[in-house]
Amino acid sequence: RSGNPTRNAFEECMTSLEDGIKGYGFSSGVAAISACVELLEPDDHVIAMDDLYGGTVRLFNEVKTKSQGITVSYVDMTNFENVENALTDKTKMIFVETPTNPLLKIADLEQIANFAKANSILSVCDNTFASSYIQKPLNFGIDIVLHSATKFLGGHSDLIAGVLVIGKDDRELIDKM
């Protein structure tokens, strides 16, 4: 569907909670992640946190690397030198989850956002475990924040939904999404 009043209200609410520009609702958190990865081209490289939700790892390793031709380097982002060392001329996205699932690792979002901007790389943060109540990645300069609404946003695991919010007024990014 191109529009739905309930989904529109959800997107507007999440955009407001995250201090963003534009939000998009999805049928699941993995669907939101998949939509972010669709912004990439074949042979693009992603630097990803080494401790991610298993569904994200499977999406990267079993689906997107095969169907889309991207490559992924998993690094421990608690040591920022690992991010710097993983950079290649094909790196187009940094994908961070903080705190991570399941080990609760914490990455410096402002440092990641600044590095991404300095290298013209899209920064994406899975904020599922923190929620916008505790942490607002867009306020640290992250380009896109996403959530699996099934977990803490829903509160009871009685719904399946996902959302992503764009944090900068980037018409090209909004149009692509």
Model-derived regions: residue spans:
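A glycine-/small-polar-enriched, mobile loop at the entrance of the PLP active site in fold-type I
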Residues: 1-16
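Walker A/P-loop NTP-binding active-site region of P-loop NTPases
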Residues: 20
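Conserved PLP-enzyme active-site core in the AAT-like
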Residues: 23-177
